[in-house]
Every structure is written in structure tokens, then in C-alpha cells.
Amino acid sequence: MNSIVIAPTFLKPSCAVGQIERHFFPNLPKEYYSHIICAEDDLKIEGDRFRTHIVPERKSVLKLDLLFRKLGWRDLVYSPDITYYSWCRRAFKEASKLIENERINYIHTINNPVSAHLVGYRLKMKYGIPWIAQFYDPWYNNPVRKYCFDYFKKKDYEREKLLAEYADIILFPNYELLNAFNDLYGNIINGSMAVIPFITEIPCRNTLTTFPNKCMNDVLTISHIGTLSADRRADVFLLALANLKQRIPELKLMVNFVGNMYSEDLKIIKELNLQSIVNVVGKVSESECQSYYENSDLFMIIDMNFRPNLFYPSKLLKYFCYGKPIFGIADKDSVVAHELVKTKNRVFRFEDIDGISSFIEQAVTDYSSICVNDIDYGSKFKTDNVIKQYVNLIEKI
């Protein structure tokens, strides 16, 4: 089976979608599947299980994106996105040439950016080739895509509706997103829908055999791995930490923030005098993250405070694969909260400072009491399991 994959960010080193897909496609059975990846950047990937077709971006258009954001013209930024103008039109032309000169069995498009799906739609209409549309994040139901004018919001709906009507297979990372999509377009969906979990390169670990039920070095190490921003802040956690430190001055605890951190949260760390127990690591490479996964006793995830929140943060699946306990700060109806409850981890409301503080104290003083989480849940993200599900779907088209 030969396919063209429309994935603009496939080769971007720091892109979560790219990291996952660079592990996914090379692990498909080489004797049955080959892929031509249409992407923006030229990153040399070892191996020969797929080939890349680089479609350069129009850099001049990217400058418009910066200008629109600076001026607050969000509707132009999100209609559908700047990649549509800087890359997708060229990608359609290049993909058309490939289809006309090679035997292509299906098209596979991946968001983000959402405009990749519009390339898939145009190719489907032009050539009639089966089309797989894969979601990583919501499109029309995405609360980050904030519009000032209803006209642009309606355009978002109309574009996603084309996907619902013409895609042969629509893939989602979780059932919450699938169900929300079905609520919007169920009466016009002609293809099939399925949930394919994210894939990870991390071998699943069993904490009962790998890690003792006590803090390593007798100091509890909590790690948050990922970017924090105005939409995903650590302020509530920091207030809870200050509350606990006031009650227990000699707190045997270290908190790592690995990744970019929001400027206001950095100010809070200084104002609350938390520098002795908070380590702001900053942004590091994917390989450098490894030691923080390995050497943590407890993982923290902070979700965006949106409704609906249908996002599945990629860091969460990596947390699961290490089998260590996790606590989250999230809305109770979010995907993150559902996953944490399902796996017997802990989740707290955004305003629950006392609850978070009490939980951290419990983790410090009685670590084994919080180690009740499902340590096998990470197996659903294993390479073999995810690849098998995808292959079963492809065989039906």
C-alpha cells in the first residue's frame, strides 16, 4: 500500500505531532506499506521506511502571520491557519504531481495545522483516492481558535464539514473528541470513525519492579514536563506549594519544570520564595527529557482551563508509560481528568489549593499510599498495539 502523507510539521524536531508521527510511520510493516511524507522542513531521518518530499514554505507569508497576531487580527490567523497560505497550496500541486506519476493507494492527512485536511479534501475531489483524516487536536470545537466575527467561525464549520462528508476514515486520539465530532456531523458522515491512541517510543515500565514505593534519595521529586503559558498556568500549584512549605519549612521536596514557563509564574516563584524547592529547567531536547522521566517520583500535568476541553496532551501518554503516579490540575469534564480518574491517579480543580497541598504532603510523608495507579495503562500506547489497529483499518479501504 502506497500513500501520500500530508503532514507539514512532520519533520519539526520540537513539534509534538511530528515526534509522534516520526515514530509511527517507520514502524508500519515495511513489506506492505510505503509512504511519501509531504513536509515543510528537511530533517534527516535515519532509515528507509518512508521518503520525504520537501515542500518549502513561503517565508514572506509567515511574516503576515506575525503581523496579524501583533495587530490582534485573530480571525485572519485562524482562517483556517497561516499554513494554508504559506504551504498548503504548494503542497497540493506537489502531491498532485506525485499521484499522477506514481501508484498511490490512499491519502493520509494530519492536523495540526488543520489546513492539511483541506489539501486532502482537494486531492480526494480531484483523484477519487481514499482519504484518511487524522485529528490530534479539535478543529471547529477548539477553544483556542477564538474568533471575533461569526463569519469566520461559520467558515471553520463549513470546512470541517467537508472532512466529515468526504473522508473515508476519520481518526481521533480519544473518544471524547470522536463523540463531539459525531454530535456535529453524524448525519452526514459517510466514512468510518475510529480511535487510534497516540504512539510512543518509550518502552512501558513497571514501577513495582523498577522503582521502590518510596521516594528516591528520600526527597520527593515532582516533574512537570511540557510548556506552560497564559492558557496553562502553574499559579495554583505554586500557591499550594507555598502553603505546604509554610506548614513544613524543612520540606523534602524538589519540583522540576521542564520546558518553557510562563513569565507570570516565574514571578510567583520569586515572590513566594520557592527557589529552594523549585527547579526551572527550561526547554531541553527530547533526549535530555529522558532523565527527568526516569528520576521523578511523581508527575504533574496542568491542563488548559477551557470548556469543552477535548485535548489529549502528548506528555500524558509518556507519563503513563513510566507507570509512576500522576496528579493533574484540570476541569472534571476534560479528557485529562477522565484519563486520570480511569487510571486511579488524582485530579484537582483549578481552585483547589488546599486539596493539592494536602496531596503533596501525603506524597512526601507516605509515598507508597499514592502508588495505587494502574501501572499497565501505558501498554495501550505501545508501538505494536497502535500499529495493529491502524493496519486493520487500512485493510478495509
Describe each region flagged by the PLM.
Residues 1-58, 169, 384:
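N-terminal subdomain of nucleotide-sugar transferases
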Residues 40-43, 163-192, 390:
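A short, active-site helix/loop in glycosyltransferases that binds the activated sugar's phosphate group
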Residues 115-118, 122-125, 151-170:
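Membrane-proximal helix-turn-helix segments that form the acceptor-binding/catalytic region
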Residues 130, 140-162, 202:
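Nucleotide-sugar donor phosphate/pyrophosphate-binding loop at the beta->alpha transition
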Residues 176, 198-199:
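Carbohydrate-associated surface elements
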Residues 214-232, 238-241, 386:
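Conserved donor-binding/catalytic core segment of Leloir-type glycosyltransferases
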Residues 232, 285-291, 299-317, 326-338:
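Nucleotide-sugar-dependent
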Residues 248, 257-259, 264-290:
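Nucleotide-activated donor-binding/catalytic signature segment of Leloir-type glycosyltransferases, i.e.
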